[in-house]
Curated annotation (Swiss-Prot):
Transcription factor that is involved in the preservation of the spiral phyllotactic arrangement leading to a regular pattern of organ initiation. Required for maintenance of stem cell fate in the shoot apical meristem, and is essential for specifying floral primordia and establishing early internode patterning events during inflorescence development. Acts as a transcription repressor of AG expression in floral and inflorescence meristems. Is also responsive of the nuclear import of SHOOT MERISTEMLESS (STM). InterPro entries: HD, Homeodomain-like_sf, KN_HD, POX_dom, TALE_homeobox. Predominantly expressed in stems, inflorescences and flowers. This is BEL1-like homeodomain protein 9. GO terms for molecular function: DNA-binding transcription factor activity; sequence-specific DNA binding. Pfam families: Homeobox_KN (PF05920), POX (PF07526). Keywords: DNA-binding, Homeobox, Nucleus, Transcription, Transcription regulation.
Length: 575
């Protein structure tokens, strides 16, 4: 017996022996120990987590022989309980250290074994084996019964259990196989799809094409408020998914091409193909999630519009662009009736109309801060581009349009207002100067301050002739008055008596106008004054008599000229 079972000196040999059931060639002779003092009923081995290895029998005639090994005594304390439904295989081994503590021969050794790591879902029939003839102490009464039990265990445990033979068959029947495969498929599946849904189509190249407007026409209608913002973000995410998938697909294709070019690496291409399938699966899951959210948002919007009483009518929507932004109402119920579409809510596949409101606010502030010179430098354009999130070309184009549409009309209006104001100020100053330089006549003064060079009709002064006759006391016909004002220029009047109607000379109409006196300068007279004019007025005689006559006549003429209809003439000329 000692030759058949060697002690364990090699770890691999120990592991192999634990998993192997040897053939039982020798007979076992079991002698029951004395019954315990408690006198309990028939108990069996506690088959929870231990393996019991039977080796040899007791070759002693004394049935009351007790085991003095403390380890065996401790083991015996577990005996006497009810039988369990599970057990492990029985192996035969020798334990010299245990045999040395006994008085005779081979002993029955019980060695615990670690928990089995088998994933088999089929319980081994040896687990439920109850050896007949087992008494309170758990030992067989006779060698024949023990031998029959060992043969039954060996027959029911048929099949190799080595590390390289039989594991596949055990794992296929394990109840943990399917959950483990599902977990692995969730994280690292490459397209098998045994326990998961079929989410990968036969043609994975469908993800390489951008989403068309027709595919998302039902969800691409602009909505106001948070609903429109959410849909805009989702569409942007969908576009980003397509772009990234294209990028990764091209990179993997390049890697596969490099594998095929190098000799000996042609077998690596299938792994890249599996990676492509996994990539397609993940990106398609993202695409389906985004499209489902878009569809849900679209349906939710339709329901809300129906509740508000505004049916959706996308055909009547017309884009209206205002300078630097968009006119759009943000109300949810009025989203179907508004005439503008928010620029920052526009779908990604449509051209943007205008710029976002935040960017336009920053650009307008800079324009009005630099109104006198609205031409930003390259540094200013880059700074504004960083602040607004726009490109440099967008900032430059906005300022070009702003200078044409906003700045230039404002400058022209300001210039027009300044021109009108200057014209009004110049006209008022000219009137003030005109008023200050014009001298009006005074009726209380003896000498007249102004007179007119207008011809008087011959039949318009019969009463003046009577007054002149009373003053001067003569019957001479006065036709002209020569007034020396000190300037050396002659002043002509058509002043005649209505009875005789003898005109002496007429005033010329081509003379200049004096701004000081308002008189016409007689430059081009037809003929010089006759020398007899002084004699007609009686001025060639005594100075006192002539002066008095001239003064009275001149005073009378001044009063007549200022009064009557000639007053209106002076008022019109000055005013």
């Amino acid at each position: 017996m000692a030759d058949a079972y060697e002690p364990y000196h090699v770890l691999q040999q120990s592991r192999r022996d634990k998993l192997r059931i040897p053939s039982l060639d020798s007979h076992f002779h079991f002698h029951p120990p004395p019954p315990p003092s408690s006198g309990g009923g028939g108990g069996v081995f506690p088959l929870a987590d231990s393996d019991f290895l039977a080796a040899g029998g007791f070759h002693s005639n004394n049935n009351n022989n007790h085991i003095s090994n403390p380890s065996y005594s401790n083991f015996m304390g577990f005996l006497g309980g009810p039988s369990s439904s599970s057990s492990t295989a029985v192996a035969v081994a020798g334990d010299h250290s245990f045999n040395a503590g006994l008085s005779s021969g081979d002993v029955l050794v019980f060695k615990p074994e670690p928990l089995s790591l088998s994933l088999s879902s089929h319980p081994r029939l040896a687990y439920d084996l109850v050896v007949p003839g087992v008494v309170n102490s758990g030992f067989c009464r006779s060698a024949g019964e023990a031998n029959a039990a060992a043969v039954t265990i060996a027959s029911r445990s048929s099949g190799p259990l080595g590390p390289f033979t039989g594991y596949a068959s055990i794992l296929k029947g394990s109840r943990f196989l399917k959950p483990a495969q599902m977990l692995l498929d969730e994280f690292c599946n490459v397209g098998r799809g045994i326990y998961t849904d079929k989410v990968i189509d036969d043609d994975d190249s469908s993800l390489l094409f951008d989403p068309t407007v027709e595919n998302l026409c039902g969800v691409s209608d602009g909505g106001g408020g948070d609903n429109g913002k959410k849909k805009s973000k989702l569409i942007s995410m969908l576009d980003e998914v397509y772009k990234r998938y294209k990028q990764y697909y091209e990179q993997l294709q390049a890697v596969m091409g490099s594998f095929e070019c190098v000799a000996g690496l042609g077998h690596a291409a299938p792994y890249a193909n599996l990676a492509l399938k996994a990539l397609s699966k993940h990106f398609k899951c993202l695409k389906n999630a985004i499209t489902d959210q878009l569809q849900f948002s679209h349906n939710n919007k339709i329901q809300q519009q129906q509740q508000c009483g505004h049916p959706m009518n996308s055909e009547n929507k017309t884009d209206s662009l205002r300078f630097g932004g968009s006119d759009s109402s943000r109300g949810l119920c009025s989203a179907g009736q508004r005439h503008g579409f928010p620029d920052h809510h526009a779908p990604v596949w449509r051209p943007h109309r205008g710029l976002p409101e935040r960017a336009v606010t920053v650009l307008r502030a800079w324009l009005f801060d630099h109104f006198l010179h609205p031409y930003p430098t390259d540094t200013d354009k880059l700074m504004l581009a960083k602040q607004t999130g726009l490109s440099r070309n967008q900032v430059s184009n906005w300022f070009i349009n702003a200078r044409v549409r906003v700045w230039k009309p404002m400058v022209e209006e300001i210039h027009m207002l300044e021109t009108r104001q200057s014209q009004r100020s110049s006209s008022s100053s000219w009137r003030d100067e005109r008023t200050s330089t014009t001298v009006f006549p005074d009726n209380s003064n003896n000498n007249p301050s102004s007179s007119s060079a207008q011809q008087r009709p011959n039949n318009s002064s019969p009463p003046r002739r009577a007054r002149n006759d009373d003053v001067h006391g003569t019957n001479n016909n006065n036709s002209y008055v020569n007034s020396g004002s000190g300037g050396g220029s002659a002043v002509g009047f058509s002043y005649g008596i209505g009875s005789s109607n003898v005109p002496v000379m007429n005033s010329s109409t081509n003379g200049g106008v004096s701004l000081t006196l308002g008189l016409h300068h007689q430059i081009g007279l037809p003929e010089p004054f006759p020398m007899t004019t002084a004699q007609r007025f009686g001025l060639d005689g005594g100075s006192g008599d002539g002066g008095g006559g001239y003064e009275g006549q001149n005073r009378q003429f001044g009063r007549d000229f200022i009064g009557g209809s000639n007053h209106q003439f002076l008022h019109d000329f000055v005013g």
